[in-house]
A protein has these predicted regions:
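Metal-dependent phosphoesterase signature
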Residues: 1-11
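Conserved Lys-Pro-Asp/Glu-containing loop-to-beta segment of HAD-superfamily phosphomonoesterases
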Residues: 75-105
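Histidine/lysine/aspartate-rich catalytic loop segments that bind and position anionic ligands
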Residues: 45-72
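A polyampholytic, Gly/Pro-enriched intrinsically disordered region
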Residues: 67-80, 137-142, 150-157
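Short, acidic/turn-prone active-site loops that include or flank metal/cofactor-
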Residues: 53-58, 118-124, 138-141
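Short, charged, surface-exposed secondary-structure boundary motifs
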Residues: 59-64, 124-132, 143-148
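Acidic, Mg2+-coordinating phosphoryl-transfer loop and its flanking beta/alpha structural elements
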Residues: 30-31, 94-135
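Substrate-recognition element of Asp-dependent hydrolases with the DxDx(T/V) motif
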Residues: 12-41, 49-55
Length: 157
């Protein structure tokens, strides 16, 4: 399957573990299928507070009968971010959203920090939509200094 052939970017597990150990909440909001996401994440799934995505619904014979679509794709990602900001009672700038596609670009409307990594359809040069951008990376750990610099900006503001 496509999910079983998908590999995580180098440094992914180390990065999410480090962020979690720092007390940072981690969420995945995706237009992909949750079963595939969980398969690709493997043991790293434990670091995420919540994963929201489309999911398969199976009939009694175990055949996929339909897909339950998440309401949190495209503009819905912005809705999710707004709901999370309210639920956690944080400033929008305390939320950092990481994405790479045009379906991720809506989140900037919440006022949260946004990082585009390995853009795939995203207008990564748009500094209104993206606080920071890593145009090409083969190591997820490249995000750590950027996240740290955003935290430092928050402390100064």
């Amino acid at each position: 399957t496509a999910a079983s052939e998908t590999k995580l970017i180098k440094g992914f597990g180390e990065t999410v573990k480090e962020l979690k150990e720092k007390g940072i909440g981690l969420y995945i909001v995706s237009g992909s299928i949750i079963e595939g996401i969980e398969l690709v994440l493997g043991e790293n799934v434990k670091y995420f507070d919540k994963i929201i995505a489309n999911h398969f619904v199976f009939d009694k014979k175990g055949v996929i009968s339909r897909i339950n679509a998440t309401k949190y794709d495209y503009e819905g990602k912005s809705v999710f971010a707004s709901e999370l900001i309210k639920k956690l009672d944080i400033s929008p700038k305390e939320l950092c959203f990481i994405g790479n596609g045009d379906n991720d670009e809506w989140v900037y409307k919440t006022g949260c920090r946004t990082i585009c990594i390995n853009p795939d359809g995203a207008d990564f040069s748009n500094t209104v939509k993206w606080s920071r951008c890593i145009q090409q990376s083969d190591d997820f750990r490249d995000l750590l200094p950027i996240i740290e610099s955003l935290e430092e900006e928050n402390e100064r503001e």
